[in-house]
Amino acid sequence: MSAIAVIDFGSQFTQLIARQIREMGVYCEIFPSNIDFETVSKFNGFIFSGGPQSVNDNCSEVSEVAHKIIKLNETINTPILGICYGQQLICHYFGAKVRKEFNQEFGKTKIKILKESPIIKDTWDVNSEVDVLMNHADSVETIPQGFTAIASGIINQTIAIIANEQRKIYCTQFHPEVKPTTNGSKLLSNFLDIANCERDWTMKSFIEKQKEKIQNLVGEKKVIAAVSGGVDSSVAAVLTHKAIGKQLNCIFIDTGLLRKSQTTAMLKEIPINYVDKSNLFLSRLKGITDPEEKRKIIGNTFIEVFEEEAKKIGDVDFLMQGTIYSDVVESGHASGNTSTIKSHHNVGGLPEKMNLKLVEPLRYLFKDEVRLLGKEIGLSDEIIFQHPFPGPGLAVRIICEVDEEKVRILQEVDEIYINTMKNYDLYDKIWQAFAVLLPVKTVGVMGDNRTYGYVCALRAVTSSDGMTADAFPFENKDQHSLVFWRFLQDISSIIVNKVSRVNRVVYDLTSKPPATIEWE
């Protein structure tokens, strides 16, 4: 099977490269810039991502693998594509001068195509002007020996595309993977053709490969699975069960932080043990308000409970989790140069001294790919298309100390919000919707009486992979917008009338970035 390795130097767009290449039918994997060369040496081609560094700084640590890949290209002609910082790194390697750009370029700009090349075949014509996204502080000042200019910036004469056709090395100063770049995905597709990649990666092939990986990793050992009833853990559990059958022991832990009607009953083909540890989780969260501390406490307690259950089963060596790629990215584990946005209870929140080894079959899949996988293995739409629910549960939707009363209030609000949304035929139009209980109370009037109750915030976003998101319905100006505004008016009235401790409802309009989807 053909495969492309993306060496991640910390760009915010790296995941978009991988997603687009996978959508073209070629398997693509992202590796940190300090990855061991032997791990990536057998790939059909390499892409060096953008990043915040400057090649004029000491970049020997982050560029060691890049230098070895360029040496590999010298030997066996493995194609390389450098994007933004990746272009600067390659040019610096070949002795070109990279300067600090006085007119730094951030945002949409135009380039002019100077010459034909396989990298822009059927993409842009010579002499045409093309919209692209630039995002750089440094620029390549001189073209390295053996390379040819394919395109240049119209405003700043930036060296926008260069190519060494003989060695199959291509560089762009702009980001072809981002939408403001016109037809940028075609450039990526051309690179796959240059690398002689077969378009044979599908969910079916992924399933077979993952089953084989799980079997080789686990052997004859037993595995316990963290099943929450959500799409990620459900898909991961069914896939693992298909790989090792009865060696998998699925456990549902009631943390006391779940939705009111959350259940795993839909997974008919897998036996599930129910464990109620709600009192334990709530007691450990007493007095805790910091969101990172909440996540780590929940992560530690979660694993502790699983270790206890593993002892009851006996001879268990592995813990399966439904970790997906957005969890890894936001926890800062995808690249040595990426900062931590938040710890996820099934990634950064794990105790360092775990007594169980991890099985994470979905670790490098995006949410939309997880849903495609769920379809392929026969899960119902009810499971596959349910909205994401965070591993720490309602603890990160209660923006203050967590206790049983606040959980009950938020469960009631959440149930009303989601069920009413379904009645309005809006649920399937929205990527994720949920309610948040705020740490403030406000004055209200009901009947002739003064009230002093909690404020709850409602959130609804559209997204494709969870990496970016827009507040619904502002991304799409259609008939759903009018329906949604009527829905918000109705739902606020229903909530304050049915949930006695809440007297005010607000709606969160913030996109991601700058915010995250969840509040904590």
UniProtKB/Swiss-Prot annotation:
GO terms for cellular component: cytosol. It catalyses: XMP + L-glutamine + ATP + H2O = GMP + L-glutamate + AMP + diphosphate + 2 H(+). ATP binds at residues 228-234. It is an enzyme of class 6 (ligase). GO terms for molecular function: ATP binding; GMP synthase activity. The keyword Ubl conjugation does not apply. The active site is at 84 (nucleophile), 175, 177. PROSITE patterns: GATASE_TYPE_1, GMPS_ATP_PPASE. Its EC number is 6.3.5.2. Keywords: ATP-binding, Glutamine amidotransferase, GMP biosynthesis, Ligase, Nucleotide-binding, Purine biosynthesis. Catalyzes the synthesis of GMP from XMP. This is GMP synthase [glutamine-hydrolyzing].
